[in-house]
């Protein structure tokens, strides 16, 4: 018999039902479970797939550059970034009638095009790209890197080039190389690019391959570096009247500490950012020499962890045994990496709008909204993934003997206390926040808005004041003109910071009130509940009160019958599954809050948010309903407009989302009967019954149906909100 899919599992390949296909797809990337897998092959497969991942990323980014160069309007946009709409790529659609062609022909294009809301134009402009030729060059370079990555992935699977397991488990060397090489050297290289190409570009001087050896980035050259007069590099910065991309009002400084924003572009000063990257490079180059390898300098991580025994013995054996536990568990390492990456991605969302790094991006409101929402959603998925792999670690890799009485074992020992505290915090936040919202709703419904319970966020306002925001009148630290910090700030460090924080034209430290207080606690409820479900799922992965022996059942078991009191919904997978709904729910509140507050800020009617956000009906009516009006007007006598595609996507997103419930709220027997009936009808229908299949059709398993339902729910939810966000923002601000 010919080899059938999946080749990696002979047991599955011989399954006579359609289960073979679905289980094959589900376990394709679970290398650990494949036939004949060895530890060595496992590490090598993962290593090779990393190169494949890099190849895909480089190909994708190359495509972005290529399509903008080919079909975009980058050169026109560079001439007038605030009024020309950046084009992502052309739309080729033979079904377009004349009204559609007219609706989507914009940005100075000759035919229908898509507008770019990704911020790439602003990014490329800031780092010194100016012409389509520059974009093509970049696209070709990335294509080359993509090919190199593919070759490297293939090469490291060949017998002669296969790394050994000991190479993969050499944690010190890997950390040193990643810290110094990946972060240190690349940050230094980026500083070099900013100083040699981007900063001259922002001052109207084009530096390319043909002249970069002739153009001095600073009039003093390397002199100040070698004579220790580093302050010369900070003297004569760009003035506040500097026109970005021209020499008008420009200075000669390359590494500054100005603080605040460039008045024209509303983005951070390029010279501040170069300085920042140089500092990061310096720190990481040192950090990359921290761990002991064959050079005999630095620390051994194992020694560090073994020595880390808490004083007084109240926390057991501290970190003993952790080195081998982490170093031998890919899931533990992946969990740590995902947790870090998730937090960083969320921080990127927060900082991209409050401290915009790219020229003119702060005035492109739709792009700001899209980037914030995009990064928050990505962060949510990555963070839930961290806990999923933490749970798999406990099931597959955790060895109680190796970790006796250390911090990991003690987490498991008092997991009831951890889970109950999280549960209490979630209940407290939920009931109090909902209670306030509902009370306020009732007061408005009865026509007595003055009876609302409105709480000023005084602690948060005090923190904002301490950082220099004067409007609350707290007169403390940086907002007090008498404090030494305030006076030092005027001259020594970041003189532009205090101006920026008190200007109302940016998103730094927005003024907050009772509406913010309430939604902040709603978001806190979502975060704590999501965390509760994820933490409980991981800590109970090996066993819980009801089912003390989950280890051999694995990560994703469905129900183990009524024998143990009914074991439905208690696998680690079920916890992950439930947590994703809460994660999406929480990010919904986060993005609604961000978007509504910013829409009112940009439109200059902040009072709408302040007055309507204190009760639920306000959110439903003045944010969701009011802003979706353009998406739900259906067909009208005016024909098509450029928001029509978003209206369609809004509808389609709802459809996909609702389809999720078909899989989430139904029992397996129902599907099996439906399938049997359809198969019966097929076999008895002339012509149709000429088509036969080898596998007996069976319904999805409980876990699979939940996964399919969750996927539709998530994708539909995100599609719906993406269409709403982009249409409601671009419809108002063009």
From Swiss-Prot:
<keyword id="KW-0460">Magnesium</keyword>
<comment type="similarity">
    <text>Belongs to the PsaA/PsaB family.</text>
</comment>
<feature type="transmembrane region" description="Helical; Name=IX">
    <location>
        <begin position="575"/>
        <end position="596"/>
    </location>
</feature>
<dbReference type="GO" id="GO:0016168">
    <property type="term" value="F:chlorophyll binding"/>
</dbReference>
<keyword id="KW-0411">Iron-sulfur</keyword>
<keyword id="KW-0813">Transport</keyword>
<feature type="binding site" description="axial binding residue">
    <location>
        <position position="662"/>
    </location>
    <ligand>
        <name>chlorophyll a B3</name>
    </ligand>
</feature>
<feature type="transmembrane region" description="Helical; Name=VIII">
    <location>
        <begin position="517"/>
        <end position="535"/>
    </location>
</feature>
<feature type="binding site">
    <location>
        <position position="671"/>
    </location>
    <ligand>
        <name>phylloquinone</name>
    </ligand>
</feature>
<keyword id="KW-0472">Membrane</keyword>
<dbReference type="InterPro" id="IPR020586">
    <property type="entry name" value="PSI_PsaA/B_CS"/>
</dbReference>
<feature type="transmembrane region" description="Helical; Name=I">
    <location>
        <begin position="46"/>
        <end position="69"/>
    </location>
</feature>
<dbReference type="Pfam" id="PF00223">
    <property type="entry name" value="PsaA_PsaB"/>
</dbReference>
<feature type="transmembrane region" description="Helical; Name=X">
    <location>
        <begin position="643"/>
        <end position="665"/>
    </location>
</feature>
<feature type="transmembrane region" description="Helical; Name=XI">
    <location>
        <begin position="707"/>
        <end position="727"/>
    </location>
</feature>
<feature type="transmembrane region" description="Helical; Name=IV">
    <location>
        <begin position="273"/>
        <end position="291"/>
    </location>
</feature>
<dbReference type="GO" id="GO:0016491">
    <property type="term" value="F:oxidoreductase activity"/>
</dbReference>
<dbReference type="InterPro" id="IPR036408">
    <property type="entry name" value="PSI_PsaA/B_sf"/>
</dbReference>
<feature type="binding site" description="axial binding residue">
    <location>
        <position position="654"/>
    </location>
    <ligand>
        <name>chlorophyll a B1</name>
    </ligand>
</feature>
<keyword id="KW-0934">Plastid</keyword>
<feature type="transmembrane region" description="Helical; Name=VI">
    <location>
        <begin position="369"/>
        <end position="395"/>
    </location>
</feature>
<keyword id="KW-0004">4Fe-4S</keyword>
<feature type="transmembrane region" description="Helical; Name=III">
    <location>
        <begin position="175"/>
        <end position="199"/>
    </location>
</feature>
<keyword id="KW-0157">Chromophore</keyword>
<feature type="binding site">
    <location>
        <position position="559"/>
    </location>
    <ligand>
        <name>[4Fe-4S] cluster</name>
    </ligand>
</feature>
<feature type="binding site">
    <location>
        <position position="670"/>
    </location>
    <ligand>
        <name>chlorophyll a B3</name>
    </ligand>
</feature>
<feature type="transmembrane region" description="Helical; Name=VII">
    <location>
        <begin position="417"/>
        <end position="439"/>
    </location>
</feature>
<keyword id="KW-0812">Transmembrane</keyword>
<keyword id="KW-0148">Chlorophyll</keyword>
<dbReference type="GO" id="GO:0009535">
    <property type="term" value="C:chloroplast thylakoid membrane"/>
</dbReference>
<keyword id="KW-0150">Chloroplast</keyword>
<keyword id="KW-0793">Thylakoid</keyword>
<keyword id="KW-0602">Photosynthesis</keyword>
<keyword id="KW-0603">Photosystem I</keyword>
<keyword id="KW-0560">Oxidoreductase</keyword>
<comment type="function">
    <text>PsaA and PsaB bind P700, the primary electron donor of photosystem I (PSI), as well as the electron acceptors A0, A1 and FX. PSI is a plastocyanin-ferredoxin oxidoreductase, converting photonic excitation into a charge separation, which transfers an electron from the donor P700 chlorophyll pair to the spectroscopically characterized acceptors A0, A1, FX, FA and FB in turn. Oxidized P700 is reduced on the lumenal side of the thylakoid membrane by plastocyanin.</text>
</comment>
<dbReference type="GO" id="GO:0009055">
    <property type="term" value="F:electron transfer activity"/>
</dbReference>
<feature type="transmembrane region" description="Helical; Name=II">
    <location>
        <begin position="135"/>
        <end position="158"/>
    </location>
</feature>
<keyword id="KW-1133">Transmembrane helix</keyword>
<dbReference type="InterPro" id="IPR006244">
    <property type="entry name" value="PSI_PsaB"/>
</dbReference>
<dbReference type="GO" id="GO:0015979">
    <property type="term" value="P:photosynthesis"/>
</dbReference>
<keyword id="KW-0408">Iron</keyword>
């Amino acid at each position: 018999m010919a080899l059938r899919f999946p080749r990696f599992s002979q047991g599955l390949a011989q399954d006579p039902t359609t289960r073979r296909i679905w289980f094959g797809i589900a376990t394709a990337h679970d290398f650990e479970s494949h036939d004949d897998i060895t530890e060595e092959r496992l590490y090598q497969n993962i290593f090779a797939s990393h190169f494949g991942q890099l190849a895909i990323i480089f190909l994708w980014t190359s495509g972005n550059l290529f399509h903008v160069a080919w079909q975009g309007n980058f050169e026109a946009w560079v001439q007038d970034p605030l009024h020309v709409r950046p084009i992502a790529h052309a739309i080729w659609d033979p079904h377009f009638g004349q009204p559609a062609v007219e609706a989507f022909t914009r940005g100075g294009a000759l035919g229908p095009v898509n507008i770019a809301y990704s911020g790439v134009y602003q990014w490329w402009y800031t780092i010194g790209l100016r012409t389509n030729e520059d974009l093509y060059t970049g696209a070709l370079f990335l294509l080359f890197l993509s090919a190199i990555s593919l070759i490297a992935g293939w090469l490291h699977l060949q017998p002669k080039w296969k790394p050994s397991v000991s190479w993969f488990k050499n944690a010190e060397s890997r950390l040193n190389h990643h810290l110094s090489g990946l972060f240190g050297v690349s940050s230094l290289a980026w500083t070099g690019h900013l100083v040699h190409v981007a900063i001259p570009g922002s001052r109207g001087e084009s530096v390319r391959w043909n002249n970069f050896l002739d153009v001095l980035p600073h009039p003093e050259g390397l002199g100040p570096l070698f004579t220790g007069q580093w302050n010369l590099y900070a003297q004569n910065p760009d003035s506040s009247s500097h026109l970005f991309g021209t020499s008008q009002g420009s200075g000669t400084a390359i590494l500054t500490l100005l603080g605040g924003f460039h008045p024209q572009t509303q983005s951070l000063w390029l010279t501040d950012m170069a300085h920042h990257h140089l500092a990061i490079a310096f720190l990481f180059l040192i950090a990359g020499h921290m761990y002991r390898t064959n050079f005999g300098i630095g620390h051994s991580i194992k020694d560090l962890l073994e020595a880390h025994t808490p004083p007084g013995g109240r926390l057991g054996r501290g970190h003993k045994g952790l080195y081998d536990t982490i170093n031998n568990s890919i899931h533990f390492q992946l969990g740590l990496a995902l947790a870090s990456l998730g937090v960083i991605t969320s921080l990127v969302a927060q900082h991209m709008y409050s401290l915009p790094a790219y020229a003119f991006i702060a005035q492109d409101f739709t792009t700001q909204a899209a980037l914030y929402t995009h990064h928050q959603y990505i962060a949510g998925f990555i963070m839930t993934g961290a806990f999923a792999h933490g749970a798999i670690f406990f099931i597959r890799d955790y060895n109680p003997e190796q970790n006796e009485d250390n911090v990991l074992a003690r987490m498991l020992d008092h997991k009831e206390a951890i889970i109950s505290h999280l549960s209490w915090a979630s209940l407290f936040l939920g009931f109090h926040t909902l209670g306030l919202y509902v009370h306020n709703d009732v007061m408005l419904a009865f026509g007595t808005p003055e009876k609302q319970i409105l709480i000023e966020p005084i602690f948060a306002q005090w923190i904002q004041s301490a950082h220099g925001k004067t409007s609350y009148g707290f007169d403390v630290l940086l907002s007090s003109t008498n404090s030494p910090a305030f006076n030092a700030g005027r001259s020594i460090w970041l003189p532009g910071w205090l101006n920026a924080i008190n200007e109302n034209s940016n998103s730094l430290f927005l003024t907050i009130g009772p509406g913010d207080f309430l939604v902040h606690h709603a978001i806190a409820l979502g975060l704590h509940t999501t965390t509760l479900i994820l933490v409980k799922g991981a800590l109970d992965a090996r066993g819980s009160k009801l089912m003390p022996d989950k280890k051999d059942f694995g990560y994703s078991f469905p129900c183990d019958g009524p024998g143990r009191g009914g074991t439905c919904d208690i696998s680690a997978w079920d916890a992950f599954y439930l947590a994703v709904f809460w994660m999406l729910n929480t990010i919904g509140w986060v993005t609604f809050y961000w978007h509504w507050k910013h829409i009112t800020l940009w439109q200059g009617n902040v009072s709408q948010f302040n007055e309507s956000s204190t009760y639920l009906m306000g959110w439903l009516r003045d944010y969701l309903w009011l802003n979706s009006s353009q998406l739900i007007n259906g067909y009208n006598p005016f024909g098509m407009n450029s928001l029509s595609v978003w209206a369609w996507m809004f509808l389609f997103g709802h459809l996909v989302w609702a389809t999720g419930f078909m899989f989430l709220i139904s029992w397996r027997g129902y599907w099996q009967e439906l399938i049997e009936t359809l198969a019966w009808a097929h076999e008895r229908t002339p012509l149709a019954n000429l088509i036969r299949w080898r596998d007996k059709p069976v319904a999805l398993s409980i876990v699979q149906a939940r996964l399919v339902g969750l996927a539709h729910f998530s994708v539909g939810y995100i599609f719906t909100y993406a269409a709403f966000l982009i249409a409601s923002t671009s419809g108002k601000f063009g």
